């Protein structure tokens, strides 16, 4: 293709073209003349005018086919931009008209509208009898829901939290104390020990150990008291003035019943029976009682050598059976604990008991303020105590020959002068228990030397096992011989191991004191505190008391450089488990309220760890047999473990009376407090262990919620909403109520907004606000109204607990209205909306709703469906008290964004047609036709093209402007820059 002509060439071409046109119209010139004229004109110099330059510019713009095509493309682009801009401008004008039109009105003042629909139920009657067919009808009862909100009973009480009390409890469990209370034998002690170890080891395997930022409980006075009391409450050390053993090898105490020849025994087991010398008829040749038992008579009681040791200078015992009448067994353990603690603090100097605490037999200045004197029957049940501690020897003998008493002397007694009458009164009257039968000897038959016949000096008394006991009780007249002999001087010094533990713990620490005193109790190899309380009496030879306390360093659970990290880790453990404990200062601030005088007594308790002995919390098990007592303890222990694993509180082991008294709470509030309290085990430790005894400690943290107000009759809000068909879109309208629960006490209704709530049996909230319900008046709340696009068809059916159904649907079936939420109750099974509706357990004729809500009339924006469709999520479109003007402004902010269109072009045109239908019907029909053509007729080709252009409209406008500027510069570049000179 030839390049475009320059200005001189174009002027020459133009002049030659004009010359040819002029010569064609002149016929007077010949061809040669015409050629001559053309040559002359070509040789003439042409000077362009302004008009020539303008014409040349037009020529230069369209000189080639490429330039022509560019101009055509530019014109097409400009036409498209103008078309789209004009169309959007017209649409915007239409949007403004649609926005200013009032939208639909929802009047939620209709309640309890009942509609009955009778449907013929298909029924096939099969019967052998002739029956007339009958038609049954299904009744559907419907009631509309005001404001699209359903209220259902809220069964859980709602508790407004006033404060939280944090309590740490250390629960001590000592099997030996429990065994002593229940009078268990050594065999059953092993079973009790195994049971406690099994339960607490299982609890320990499921709990992690960590520390509370409340201090070590071992430094606490209450802990020290309970620990010392649990281990050494009834332990004492008695010091003789000088070592004095028992004066004889045998002892005659006929007031004690004897074991029967055949079991079972009539009387319960007597400890002195362990020392009984039973007369056996078979003995080896040459056997004599003197060679084995010394001066002790066969048929009496033999005192073993360990009770007759000449070097015994002290007596160590752990028993509560020597206390006076002040220690009443009918009192509970806690009452006796307080009494003993008071007595010891008043009757001791450091750890030594004052003289007035002892009986006269122990000290000449004694007044029996703490211990009592021995009675004659004590030797039967507490033989070691009598033999080691008694200062005198009382012989109660019914043996023939003692004190020169004979049969003739008995018959001369005043009460025995009529023997025939006395025998009718009692068979034991006026006779000896043991008669003298001759010298002791063993007779053998033939060569038999091992199994010979033994003849005792006195008769065998087992057949009359209760002779002496009945004689002591004066059950019959007869001889009573009592002999009193001095054994020791009554100048005892008595020391309390409990007071020694309490006083030394302040100086040496509880761990060191416990170790030393427990070692002291094990002086003979058998721990005295693990013996039976009736026999826990041992003699010692010059023991060192007080013992030497070792320097025991407390176990450090964390390094110093990791102290802060470890502490924060423990607190995080609490936080992760749902507890609000965040430090000692915060805990005490939650617990302590100095301005509340009713709490001041409780504050001192809560600042320290609460220490509890398990045996003090149990029922009275002294009347139970061994296995029954173990089962009782097992039941309590298993229940405690189960409750702790459930993070609840076993109120058997911690009393709540102080909360009720100090906080002035009612019994109903106390029930809430007990139910909502939480527990957390923070350590389980076995402190001691042996074959027959074990002791454990359980550290438990409690959080006790103190209620400020309790809301009982509550209704829960179910916001189902209301359906609206707007601008071709199905929209779900909801009112955002400011409350979640309605409380109705008597006839007074309260609308409650709950914050920071946890569900733990009851609903416990930090904040409960009383708000106003939604309404159109100024006395009610202005609630936001939201719209959400939903798909057609919309069917929501929810079964209610009363047997009815909550229905919200966009279509009608079984005469159930569309768009309006309804409560539906049927009397027979019927299928609606593809769902089977079943009748309730009983027939309901009317569905009542409580409480009632105020009147609410709501106007929605005209294009609420368009707004919800644009946002594609639930948005606020108005409020219950918003003015029409504000509503229109809100709608404009949402709808005018369509000026810069986003989306499929045919769909947008159809949406515009739907929005215009009720405002400008003719335009709506035209737009609908265009949308149908673009989406259907042209199979989307043209529509897609236009849609792409619509998406790129801002880009195309920018490109068009850039092209115009570029073409202008290009056109300017085509113009000649310099004039040609001839």
From Swiss-Prot:
Pfam families, per database record: Foamy_virus_ENV
Site (Cleavage) location in chain: 126-127, 566-567
InterPro entries per UniProt: Foamy_env
Glycosylation sites: 109, 141, 183, 309, 346, 390, 404, 412, 484, 522, 551, 776, 802, 827
Domains: entry comment: The ER retention signal plays an important role in establishing the intracellular site of budding.
Other comment: Foamy viruses are distinct from other retroviruses in many respects. Their protease is active as an uncleaved Pro-Pol protein. Mature particles do not include the usual processed retroviral structural protein (MA, CA and NC), but instead contain two large Gag proteins. Their functional nucleic acid appears to be either RNA or dsDNA (up to 20% of extracellular particles), because they probably proceed either to an early (before integration) or late reverse transcription (after assembly). Foamy viruses have the ability to retrotranspose intracellularly with high efficiency.
Name assigned to this protein: Envelope glycoprotein gp130
Species of the source: Simian foamy virus type 3 (strain LK3) (SFVagm)
């Amino acid at each position: 293709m030839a390049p475009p002509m320059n200005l001189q060439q174009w002027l020459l071409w133009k002049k030659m073209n004009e010359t040819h046109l002029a010569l064609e119209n002149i016929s007077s010139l010949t061809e040669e003349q015409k050629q001559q004229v053309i040559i002359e004109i070509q040789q003439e110099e042409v000077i362009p005018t302004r008009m020539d330059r303008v014409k040349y510019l037009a020529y230069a713009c369209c000189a080639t086919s490429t330039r022509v095509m560019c101009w055509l493309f530019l014109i097409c682009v400009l036409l498209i931009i103008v078309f789209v801009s004009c169309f959007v401008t017209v649409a915007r004008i239409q949007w403004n008209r649609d926005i200013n039109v009032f939208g639909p009105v929802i009047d939620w003042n209709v309640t309890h509208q009942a509609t009955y629909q009778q449907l013929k139920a298909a029924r096939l009657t099969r019967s052998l009898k002739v029956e007339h067919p009958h038609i049954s009808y299904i009744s559907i009862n419907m009631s509309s829901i005001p404001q699209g909100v359903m209220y259902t009973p809220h069964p859980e009480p709602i508790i407004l939290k006033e404060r939280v009390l944090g309590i740490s409890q250390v629960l001590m469990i000592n099997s030996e104390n429990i065994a002593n209370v229940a009078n268990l034998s050594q065999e059953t002690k092993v079973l009790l020990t195994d049971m406690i170890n099994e339960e607490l080891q299982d609890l320990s395997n499921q709990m992690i150990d960590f520390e509370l930022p409340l201090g070590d409980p071992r430094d606490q006075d209450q802990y020290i008291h309970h620990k010392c009391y649990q281990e050494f409450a009834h332990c004492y050390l008695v010091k003789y003035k000088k070592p004095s053993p028992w004066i004889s090898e045998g002892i005659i105490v006929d007031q004690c019943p004897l074991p029967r020849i055949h079991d079972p025994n009539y009387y319960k087991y007597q400890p002195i029976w362990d020392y009984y010398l039973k007369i056996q008829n078979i003995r080896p040749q040459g056997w004599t009682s003197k060679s084995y038992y010394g001066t002790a008579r066969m048929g009496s009681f033999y005192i073993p050598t360990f009770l007759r040791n000449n070097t015994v200078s002290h007596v160590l015992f752990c028993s509560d059976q020597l206390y006076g009448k002040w220690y009443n067994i009918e009192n509970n353990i806690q009452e006796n604990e307080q009494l003993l603690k008071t007595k010891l603090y008043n009757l001791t100097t450091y750890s030594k008991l004052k003289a007035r605490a002892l009986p006269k037999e122990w000290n000449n200045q004694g007044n029996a303020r703490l211990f009592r004197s021995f009675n004659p029957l004590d030797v039967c049940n507490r033989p070691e105590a009598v033999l080691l501690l008694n200062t005198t020897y009382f012989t109660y003998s019914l043996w023939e020959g003692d004190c020169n008493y004979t049969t003739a002397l008995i018959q001369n007694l005043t009460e025995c002068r009529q023997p025939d009458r006395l025998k009718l009164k009692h068979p034991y009257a006026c006779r000896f228990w043991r008669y003298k039968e001759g010298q002791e000897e063993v007779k053998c038959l033939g060569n038999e030397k091992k199994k010979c016949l033994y003849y005792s000096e006195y008769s065998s008394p087992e057949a009359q096992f209760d002779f002496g006991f009945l004689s002591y009780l004066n059950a019959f007249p007869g001889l009573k011989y009592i002999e009193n002999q001095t054994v020791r001087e009554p100048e005892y010094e008595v020391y309390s191991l409990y007071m020694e533990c309490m006083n030394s713990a302040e100086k040496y620490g509880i761990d060191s004191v416990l170790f030393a005193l427990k070692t002291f109790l094990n002086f003979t190899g058998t721990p005295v505190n693990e013996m039976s309380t009736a026999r826990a009496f041992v003699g010692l030879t010059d023991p060192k008391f007080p013992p030497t306390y070792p320097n025991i360093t407390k176990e450090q659970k964390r390094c110093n450089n990791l102290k802060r990290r470890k502490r924060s880790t423990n607190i995080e453990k609490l936080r992760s488990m749902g507890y609000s404990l965040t430090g000692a200062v915060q805990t005490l601030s939650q617990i302590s309220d100095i301005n509340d005088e009713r709490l001041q007594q409780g504050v001192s308790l809560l600042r320290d760890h609460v220490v509890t002995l398990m045996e003090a919390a149990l029922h009275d098990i002294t009347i139970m047999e061994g296995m029954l007592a173990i089962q009782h303890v097992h039941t309590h222990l298993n229940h405690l473990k189960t409750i702790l694993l459930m993070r609840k509180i076993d109120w058997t082991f911690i009393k709540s009376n102080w909360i009720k008294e100090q906080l002035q709470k009612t019994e109903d509030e106390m029930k809430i407090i007990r139910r909502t309290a939480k527990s957390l085990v923070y350590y389980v430790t076995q402190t001691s262990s042996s074959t027959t005894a074990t002791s454990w400690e359980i550290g438990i943290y409690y959080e006790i919620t103190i209620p400020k107000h309790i809301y009982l009759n509550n209704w829960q809000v179910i916001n189902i909403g209301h359906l609206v068909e707007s601008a071709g879109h199905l929209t779900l309208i909801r009112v955002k109520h400011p409350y979640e629960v309605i409380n109705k006490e008597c006839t007074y209704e309260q609308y409650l907004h709950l914050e920071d709530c946890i569900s733990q049996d009851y609903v416990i909230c930090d904040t409960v606000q009383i708000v106003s319900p939604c309404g159109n008046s100024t006395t009610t709340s202005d609630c936001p109204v939201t719209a959400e696009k939903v798909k057609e068809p919309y069917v929501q059916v929810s079964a209610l607990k009363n047997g009815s159904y909550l229905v919200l649907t966009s279509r009608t079936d079984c005469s159930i209205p569309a768009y309006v939420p309804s409560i539906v109750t049927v009397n027979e099974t019927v299928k609606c909306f593809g769902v089977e509706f079943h009748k309730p357990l009983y027939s309901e004729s009317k569905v009542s709703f409580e409480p009632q809500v105020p009147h609410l009339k709501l106007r929605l924006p005209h294009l609420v469906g368009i707004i919800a469709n644009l946002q594609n999520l639930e948005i606020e479109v108005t409020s219950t008290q918003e003015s029409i003007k504000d509503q229109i402004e809100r709608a404009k902010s949402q709808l005018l964004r369509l000026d810069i269109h986003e989306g499929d072009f045919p769909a947008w045109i159809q949406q515009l047609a739907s929005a215009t239908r009720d405002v400008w019907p003719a335009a709506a029909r035209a737009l609908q036709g265009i949308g149908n053509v673009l989406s259907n007729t042209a199979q989307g080709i043209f529509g897609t093209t236009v849609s792409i252009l619509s998406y790129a409209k801002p880009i195309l406008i920018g490109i068009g402007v850039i092209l115009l500027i570029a073409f202008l510069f290009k056109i300017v570049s085509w113009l000649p820059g310099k004039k040609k000179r001839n």
